[in-house]
Amino acid sequence: IAIEDYHETNEPVVEANVVTPGFFNCHVHIMEPVGFGTDKEFTFIEKTFYTQKHLEDYINSGVTFIRVLGTENDYDMDIRDCVDAGIVKGPHMLCAGRCICMTGGHGWQGGIEADGQDECRKAARTLLKKGVDLVKIMATGGVMTKGVEPGSAQLTQEEMAVIIEEAHKAGRKTATHAQGTQGIKNALYAGIDSIEHGIFLDQ
């Protein structure tokens, strides 16, 4: 069924190619210069140009939407706004800003450390005030933070629940880094919208 009568067109026929809608990449960290596994310290300028290259690579590979789940100093929102304004070329972006983690927990170097329900609620409100599109929470440890047990539960169910409550009141979704089983369950019982990784899901 067409919305208008059929008519001839002079557009060329595309042969031996495939046309698809734009792809979504729903878990990225756009300021990671060369991926994981390096101890090199990068300057802010280096990270900025790597970010620009990553954005161009997404577009050139057909990715037209990305979900950015954790960026130091909330820089992803500045980048998002520059893309939206046409200052830099890149895909559409949903940005989480900094993650919320327990003190010394996974992602503490670039996240907001929060302990107890009051601090967690304040952290969520701070991010929402800055304009995040969603809120990222650290429910468990992770392999990229030295001295942390990747599978261990970190933020508690009660701590995550108040973060999720604040996000939902503002009309925002939530996502959690969750690898170990107990942390995954804590996040689910707290009302999380999205489990990231879920390595040790048991059902």
Walk through the language-model features, giving the residues of each:
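Active-site gating/metal-coordination segments in enzymes
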Residues: G104-A161, D193
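Active-site core of metal-dependent hydrolases
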Residues: M144-Q203
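Hydrophobic faces of well-ordered beta-strands that scaffold small-molecule active sites
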Residues: G22-V28, I66-R67, M93-G97, V135-I137, ...
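N-terminal small/glycine-rich loop or linker at the start of catalytic domains
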Residues: P21-G37, L94-G110, M160-A161
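Alpha-helical scaffold segments that flank or form the walls of functional sites
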Residues: T38-K89, I112-K136, E165
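Conserved, mostly hydrophobic/aromatic
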Residues: A16, H27, G62, M93, ...
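Active-site environment of divalent metal-dependent phosphoester hydrolases
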Residues: H29-P33, V68-D76, C101-T103, G141-T145, ...
